[in-house]
């Protein structure tokens, strides 16, 4: 909050007071300049300290204060303190609008858009970035226009990428809304590229080429993606930008993987590995090793795959990346099985189990347990195949975990496994003791793998009484115990809506606000009746005092609107004097807001509804040594076609020989896109 405004310097008698104010102004400016110098040197923490000190001293120069707000917001952004960055960029926007600084308003809107994008508030970010674009075009600022186009493209790209991660789909296999979002990103990047070519800005052209390549990669246009990434690579080499060059090689490798050119992809990943060592970035070095390990798995060179996965494991341990360490152990287990070394594979499977338990990865834990049981059976350490067919699932049903991929213990691979959530919620009785493998055509749709989802007319089979058929080779079905919700004689829908209405009716009373009538018995008169009392009451009729009721609502809402208004006098570091009070009062626009303002307001308010939605279940954290583009689902499909070639011929019983290999499709890796 701003401190009480002292009198202006010219209002105080004597030159001493004027010298004091001059020193205060000089002190504020000097502190801000030192903060700017430190931020340019990369010391953002120290820079923030000087900027905050400048705000504490305060200034009556509105332009200086606006610049301090902008610099503070940027410094907090680089420190990843996005809430504080958002706060100061809002201060900057408010002050710029108040003094009528259109260019300052454009820059503040752009900074707000970038911060909102990082916070995942994409719709609000688009509104702010569009405001930046509109003002830049209005002022004829070509550089600002290009920057605004690039920022809008970034917001659409980030939104599309997040949606594709949530959908857990491969590049090119995306829902229509995600594709539309990415097409919008591509349009703005194309406009940005055209403008920066006109301006002759080669560095900006490189950024546009790189982002166009990334967008086309997500859309599944892999040939176009390689074209753009080659342009990005050429410009990075032109500027000697090793970090950008490394990213271009990595992106080229990802695109060539999906084009089926695994050997070309391996060469690009090797270049990535060399550059990551040159710039001394261990995290990206580990990512390159991981990508090379997966590439050599696709090339069926399992010894080299294991070599690179071991390098990944060592770096992940050095960086304390437990997610990456677990993924490396899982990959090493599969590689050693493919090389015919189940004993070494068992060691890594046990390590994978331990790490999955530590980080709370339920899917990984189930996968590791099944791998261990399978490998122990193959090594002859289990006396009964039933022990491998029934791994320890205790605690999974109670905690509601739904493993996505599991392993089959027959001659083929396990298919996608999901628990029927609707039955779990409706409380039907299931027993975990009898495992049954119905054919794929008889499974309900949520329990089929993506590979078999094209069958539209599947019907669920119920377990037969007294049946003890062996494990079918098609699928495995995990069944859950009865939940605590009793079944009503009515249908599922009636039961659900009955429970919902009872629950919601009790919540309504909690949201009522008492009316201040000033009478002693008002509290008793407005007390909410209990559930039983409401059930006995007749239906409520309309009140005759309708006008008074709406007047009450209007007065209440008007007070709430006043509470939400931004006050210029509350800006930190602002000293209001006679010199600047005219700017604060006179530069506002007296005319009524136009359609553009109301359209922007509607978009903003509609995005606020999403903030009140329940968040989806948390996904696994992404370790620093794990690349964003994992392409592991491609390995799953390729490996599924080569299962016969990868089987290990172990001496032992027929059961051991038929047990097969741990399926590399058991678990979707964190970060798969």
From Swiss-Prot:
Residues 420-477, 510-544, 609-628, 645-673 are annotated as: Disordered. The modification Omega-N-methylarginine is found at residue 418. Residues 1-507 are annotated as: Mediates association with membranes. It comes from the Eukaryota. InterPro entries: GoLoco_motif, GPSM, TPR-like_helical_dom_sf, TPR_rpt. Induction: Up-regulated in prefrontal cortex and core region of nucleus accumbens during late withdrawal from chronic cocaine administration. Phosphorylation regulates interaction with G(i/o) alpha. Residues 493-515, 546-568, 594-616, 628-650 form the GoLoco domain. This is G-protein-signaling modulator 1. The gene is Gpsm1.
